[in-house]
């Protein structure tokens, strides 16, 4: 009898413990009448009317809700709670599908929120707006800019990567495949030539980067564009035990210039090394080390390329090199193999140091005082200056540290970062004015004249 009683109680406990819990499902979707404001932003304020460049528009939809605000009265020291109305950004997946659309000034819907043209006259100011139901954004003005003169002769820059490999007895050895180097250079070429971007202000440099196929003695290279330098145990030990060996590697390159600095009139030199294990968001000392051009032909004014200190020199040969960075740059192996390792979300792109090597300046501006008199930071009027600390994303604004957003002398402008010199960017384009600067450097700076020789591709002068 007792056994049946125990079974009965166990059965009752079983059923009571499995009672279905009540569930509450909240519908977080926003109703149209809960939307209070629509904001429209664009990729840039100018569009090139070439039928390739596209102006992308981005909508930001806001709502308002009454919430409780809590605080403490400074005089009475008593705590209080009161209702206030707060505006909040509505996530796109909580909006009704296709409820917000972007229109041109004639009321035409923009397919995919992009606008491109070949017929709008330069100087035309087009207006666009976003609309959902009866609610519209403010009008956004976009200027159609002049078509740039792209009647350049295409130049091919031969590149040699020098792999500085430590001895296996002292540090992990490594290798980099020719296929990887080719892919890296192809992407740089594509970024320089407007092939992988929708940037509305992208330029076409007609500059191509290719791996050299002949070495400095005129012999065909077994692995195109790849020169391996095996550092001896003695030399590596002399570099010390620090995890950062930037200075030591630069000195090593110069001391062994006959092997690993190839004629700058025939090659663009890039040295790959694990010169530091440090990381930084900017990458300018951890991903690569470089110098802007240092010499200009005497036919040109030194001030013709502003922002760079140069001197006149009509030729630049191996015998003129006092710092290897005058004729190339050093690249951290970690940045090449794992682009986010040393720069975090500001993913490394080989196009960045190559553009700087060709005279383009950084667009970021950490302090308001860094700006030039015309409100610029890189001497290219069609790029935006920005404080990367305020905008760690591809979507940025031009307000800077210490400058209020409502400064009437510098109205707030939002833009999208495609530029290879922007931080937190798609890094897939150069602007039209940056392209002009690159072409000036290639024409005027003797240390950047490797493209004038076919030696790297033929083994002959």
Where would I find each of the regions flagged by the language model?
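Sec-dependent bacterial lipoprotein signal peptides
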Residues: 1-17
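Short, aromatic- and glycine-rich surface loops/edge beta-strands on solvent-exposed regions
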Residues: 121-134
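Propeptide-to-catalytic entry region of secreted or membrane-anchored zinc metalloproteases
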Residues: 103, 133-264, 275, 443-450, ...
């Amino acid at each position: 009898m007792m056994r049946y009683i125990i079974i009965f109680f166990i059965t009752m406990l079983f059923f009571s413990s499995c009672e279905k819990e009540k569930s509450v499902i909240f519908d977080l979707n926003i109703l149209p009448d809960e939307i209070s404001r629509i904001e429209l932003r664009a990729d840039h304020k100018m569009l090139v009317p070439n039928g390739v460049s596209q102006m992308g528009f981005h909508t930001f939809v806001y709502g308002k809700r009454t919430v409780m605000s809590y605080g403490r009265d400074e005089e009475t020291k008593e705590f209080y709670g009161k209702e206030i109305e707060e505006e909040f950004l509505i996530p796109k997946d909580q909006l009704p599908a296709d409820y917000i659309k972007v229109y041109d000034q004639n009321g035409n819907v923009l397919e995919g929120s992009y606008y491109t043209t070949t017929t709008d006259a330069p100087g035309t100011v087009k207006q666009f707006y976003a609309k959902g139901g009866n609610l519209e954004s403010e009008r956004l003005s976009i200027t159609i800019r002049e078509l740039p003169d792209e009647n350049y002769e295409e130049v091919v820059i031969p590149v040699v990567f020098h792999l500085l490999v430590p001895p296996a007895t002292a540090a992990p050895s490594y290798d980099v495949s020719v296929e990887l180097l080719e892919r890296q250079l192809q992407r740089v070429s594509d970024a320089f030539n407007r092939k992988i971007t929708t940037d509305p202000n992208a330029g076409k440099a007609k500059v191509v980067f290719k791996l050299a196929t002949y070495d400095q003695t005129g012999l065909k290279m077994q692995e195109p564009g790849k020169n391996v330098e095996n550092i001896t145990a003695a030399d590596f030990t002399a570099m010390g035990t620090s995890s950062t060996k930037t200075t030591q590697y630069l000195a090593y390159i110069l001391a062994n210039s006959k092997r690993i600095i190839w004629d700058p009139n025939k090659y663009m030199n890039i040295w790959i090394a694990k010169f530091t294990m440090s990381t930084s968001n900017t990458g300018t000392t951890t991903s690569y080390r470089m110098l802007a051009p240092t010499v200009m032909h005497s036919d040109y004014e030194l001030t013709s390329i502003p922002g760079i200190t140069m001197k006149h020199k009509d030729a630049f040969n191996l015998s003129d090199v006092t710092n290897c960075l005058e004729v190339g740059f050093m690249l951290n192996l970690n940045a090449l193999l794992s682009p986010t390792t040393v720069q975090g979300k500001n993913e490394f792109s080989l196009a960045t140091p190559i553009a700087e090597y060709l005279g383009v300046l950084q667009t970021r501006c950490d302090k308001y005082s860094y700006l030039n008199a015309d409100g610029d930071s890189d001497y290219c009027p069609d790029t935006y200056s920005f404080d990367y600390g305020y905008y760690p994303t591809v979507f940025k604004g031009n307000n800077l540290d210490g400058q209020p957003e409502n400064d009437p002398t510098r109205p707030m402008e939002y833009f999208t970062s495609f530029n290879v010199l922007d931080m937190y960017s798609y890094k897939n384009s150069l602007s039209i004015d940056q392209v002009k600067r690159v072409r000036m450097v290639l024409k005027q700076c003797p240390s950047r004249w490797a493209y004038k020789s076919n030696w790297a591709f033929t083994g002959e002068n």
